[in-house]
From Swiss-Prot:
Gene: MXR1
Keywords: Oxidoreductase, Phosphoprotein
SUPFAM superfamilies: Peptide methionine sulfoxide reductase (SSF55068)
InterPro entries recorded: Met_Sox_Rdtase_MsrA_dom, Met_Sox_Rdtase_MsrA_sf, MsrA_MetSO_reductase
UniProt-listed Enzyme Commission number(s): 1.8.4.11
Family in the record: Belongs to the MsrA Met sulfoxide reductase family.
Lineage: Eukaryota, Fungi, Dikarya, Ascomycota, Saccharomycotina
Name under which the protein is recorded: Peptide methionine sulfoxide reductase
Organism: Saccharomyces cerevisiae (strain ATCC 204508 / S288c)
Length: 184
């Protein structure tokens, strides 16, 4: 059975909020958020979200191999826990639009497939509305071609442990060439 929240993320619902982001390979996404925002976020975890579940899916059956096989429609994502008194949804989303190419559909650099789509998965109706507004404000900066999907979070599965902090554990590991901080 899926959840909407990582089973291992540090998160206090009394003071923290969540956003789940898809911007290509989750290794690079996690690395960028930790490199630039680690002191301002509570925690983050990589996983798989907003795919088509079957009745037989369980946390152990939704895997990197299945997601990359292309038959699940899950996106590789980063779930971020944050205190809105420390960093806002707008700041997290502005950063999102600066660290990948949101104009490509189902790809980032050489990575192709629905698992690499650009997406913002909201954990509340208020966040859904705010994300749509922020996307519209970013449209002119990207030539009015942003392909980022904005949806409510439907489901979330933690990625396997070896994917967590992958580029910290494997400094020479693959990093998508579209993951860099743009001046905009």
């Amino acid at each position: 059975m899926s959840s909407l929240i990582s089973k291992t993320i540090k998160y206090d619902p009394a003071k923290d909020k969540l956003i789940t982001l898809a911007c290509g390979c989750f290794w690079g996404t996690e690395h960028m958020y930790r490199k630039y925002l680690n002191d301002r976020i509570v925690d983050c975890k990589v996983g798989y979200a907003n795919g088509e579940e079957s009745k037989k899916d369980s946390p152990s059956s939704v895997s990197y191999k299945r997601v990359c096989g292309g038959d699940t429609d899950f996106a590789e994502v980063l779930q971020v826990s944050y205190n809105p008194k420390v960093i806002t949804l707008r700041e997290l989303t502005d950063f999102f639009f600066r660290i990948h190419d949101p104009t490509t559909s189902n790809s980032q650099g050489p990575d192709k497939g629905t698992q690499y789509r650009s997406g913002l998965f909201a954990h509340s109706d208020a966040d859904l509305k705010e994300l749509a507004k922020i996307k519209e404000e970013w449209q002119p900066k990207w030539g009015n071609k942003i392909a980022t999907v904005i949806e409510p979070i439907k489901n979330f599965y933690d990625a396997e442990e070896y994917h967590q902090l992958y580029l910290d554990k494997n400094p020479q590991g693959y990093a998508c060439p579209t993951h860099y901080l743009r001046e905009m």
